[in-house]
From Swiss-Prot:
Highest rank taxon of the organism: Bacteria
Signal peptide limits: none
Cellular-component GO terms for this entry: ribonucleoprotein complex; ribosome
Protein name, as recorded: Large ribosomal subunit protein bL36
Length: 40
């Protein structure tokens, strides 16, 4: 899991989902788990 300032490039990857949990924004990607990230 990476912490990124901007998730814009990650959310364009195939299989990416943008999820809000507890006020934080996450990108989860089942196809490519290395693209998991959190913003903030």
């Amino acid at each position: 899991m990476k912490v990124r300032n901007s998730l814009r490039s990650l959310k364009n990857k195939p299989g990416a989902q943008v999820v809000r949990r507890r006020g934080k924004v996450y990108v989860i990607n089942k196809k490519e788990p290395r693209f998991k990230a959190r913003q903030g």
